[in-house]
Amino acid sequence: LAVKRHCEQPLYDYAPPPDSQRNQSVKKSTTVILAGLTMVGPLAIDTYLPSFHAIGQDFAVSDLLVQQTLSVFLFSFAFLMLFYGTLSDSFGRRPIILGSLAIYTVASVGAALAPSFGWLLAFRCVQGLAAGGGAVISRAVVRDRASGAEAQQVLAYMMMVFGLAPAIAPILGGWLHVTLGWRSVFWFLAAFGLLMLITCYRALPESLPASSRHAFHPGLIAANYWKVLRNARFLLLAVSIGVAFSGFGLYIGSAANFVIKILGLSETAFGWMFIPLISGMTIGSALAARIARKVAPTRMIAVGYAVMVVAALANVGYNYAFKAAVPWAVLPLMLYAFGLALATPTLTVLALDVFPDNRGLAASLQSFIQMLLFALVSGTVAPLLFESAFKLACGVLAGLVLSIVCALLARRLRRA
């Protein structure tokens, strides 16, 4: 009945408290805490990658099964990203952040103590369900407390930390693995979760007053999501972003094989893969921000895709002609990440502008689709290709072609 009564109303979107209820500034300590919350997910994804082979040997399972500990985490992470924002709008930011961090910490301890592979898989699922809370709600906290240039500055700082985490995590994880064994990685994740839990409990106050909260209607939320999913142009744009970004998923899902078996490096050398990836993304993002007002959106997308095509073709050509080795095997990945960073922001804006009055809901779904495709590629496609650098390169090129086709179809729908 609630769905029927509200089906003709505007789609649900997050509305920040009125200016009179916002603080005039976000404290530096709060910014540091929020940045720390954005690290929870990337650390849980990337820190244990150097331990893949050791986990398989310890539990006597194949690399393909170990791969599913990443896939299960990503699927769980993507699923609850749809609901964390809505839950925090109804019950407040603080309870959801604290609850998700508590569950994440317990799940990390469970993974560290897992007596069998089945238990490890189960705890990774719970980890994934809990890890998205901080990443999603931290952005809402910024919107509660600040607006305009200050909000942009805080979000930029958070995104910088979010971008650095995947570069640091596998290096730290490799050191922990070599020094203390693979279980120490999950003890580290548990310690970080506990640190964030204590810090948020003591220093992060509630930012959404009770007067600004919404009633929780699961049926209405589901109906509103369905309205967005029925829009073909939005779906095409979201898929074009997700498939292009899944080039990362292919290499992250194959990271252990790519670094250790293909490149012949040690567990402590994962920086050879992740630092170029993150560097390309960071440089591309900085350039995109500087030229955003000077370059037309369609031109920005075209340049980004052109760079990605050159990178993907160079990657295929190199791995066809030569045996993969550093630094040449990772330079095309850096260039691909650079092009992706140029195209993705504009594609994201175009996707959200399909629903100009409901960008919050559209953003949640776009993030969900991106993470879902990332999980599918890293969990199902990567195991089919990760024995060969040439196959991985061809997989990235195939995904890029699909992304370009989706973007062109979305452009045609806009003209129609």
Predicted segments — roles?
Residues 51-80:
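Extracellular/periplasmic helix-loop-helix junction of adjacent transmembrane segments
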Residues 119, 148, 156-202:
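Helix-loop-helix hairpin linking two adjacent transmembrane segments in secondary transporters
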